[in-house]
Amino acid sequence: MSIHAIKPIKTKKNAESFSSSTEEGQPLSPMARLFHESDSNVYIIVIIGFETRLNPEVIKANLVHTFLKQPRFSCVQVADEKNGGELKWVRAEVDLDNHVKVPTPDPNMESADLYVEDYVSNLSKTRISMSIPMWDLHLLNVKTSDAEAVGILRVHHSLGDGSSLMQLFMSCTRKLSDPESLPSLPFSKKKKPDSSSGGFLQYFINLFSVFLIYWNTLVDVVMFFITTFFLDDTKTPLKGPLGVASTPRRIVHRTLSLEDIKLVKNAMNATINDVMVGITEAALSRNLNRKYGQIKKDAGEAVGSNNLPKNIRLRATHFVNLRPYLAAKEDISEMIKSSSSVKLGNMIGYVLFPFTIGLREDALDYIRSAKATGKRKKATLEAIYTYLMAKFFIKYFGAKWASFPTQTTLWFSNVPGPQEEVTCFGHQVAYVAPTCYGQPNALMIHAVSYVNKMKIIISVDEGVVPDPHQICDDLEESLKMIKNIVIQKGLVD
């Protein structure tokens, strides 16, 4: 199969040149500065599996017309001595040989999957020099169990968040079925208010809804401050110590059936996110029960079917995209018509999301619990508050006062991916698996959809969580168990 360069989408006018960009010479935004702090010096890793071998020269040629059109991918971050040493964007000449790495695989490797896994883990031990734009791309022509080749994109989080990088990635892709067309993202249709009920009753309902949002926000803000100063999660085998942000990571991923997730979603009248949180609660409960059972066994105590301590407090720093247009547009072609039109940045807030840990008699209670908590977290301005507070503290007190919470057990995030099979620079994509390293937690769980698959990515500090593959097994088994119960109870149409 021949590999062709990406075909551009025709637009009414070309994107502005870099000289007219507002990035050059500007200081880094408060959120970008936050990602340079020692306990939040975060890098985004995107592992992309391909159905064909990679052609490095074709990819380099296309990067010139895509990534390098993005100001942040062709800028270095330098200290502005005239402004107290604050970092600012300065344009630089980009030598792609400094950014695109094509290693020669060991011909005697025992396992291609383990080779790629170790390669990514070794990347997490390094940082990108600030003397060049802070991104690189590693092309591994290694056949693994689920791909013919693997690309690994590494980007410092100061360049942009997961949602904006997903837009940039999608601007570099085309539908496999139609090479002239951009792919589409799933989007949420907001329910229209029922106009049949009006008058005083509707006014009262609206007023109560507004009151509820502000009340929930007040409660969440109080909980945020309590957490910041002294409320830590329970010290479980999944909870990392202080300083874990600087440790290397083991990154693994597993593919789940998106159709199975949708089956549970429809049966429980829930959302995809509710189901993902529910199966994660179930999986972490199984995992911790096993670990506590081993602790009891090692101590010579009797091991039962339920070894979990009571009242485990386990919370996730759950990241929320604050770009409202991503949830409102079905056709994103205008947003990603070219790579230069994608607006990179860190428009993210977060909520402190409690996970209910315990062994349930009815596994569907995991979904019900996740649904109830998710509904509660939607009726709050907590994510906007954490975003604005971070900006405020960074602006007036410095980034050291606005670090991400270390009191939670894990980071949790999900990003919707393309609904159709796509090609990237002419190479058919098999999967997309984004995650991070440098975060102040020992465990991160990320989910991203692609066509009819849901990819789960686990990033762990092996010194704290030595069994990331077992967590993947637990997630897979939890989804299977919940799906089977849904079918057995006749909840499927």
Regions found by a protein language model. Name each.
Residues 2-26, 36, 45-441, 445-476, ...:
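Soluble acyl-CoA-dependent acyltransferase catalytic core bearing the H(X)4D motif
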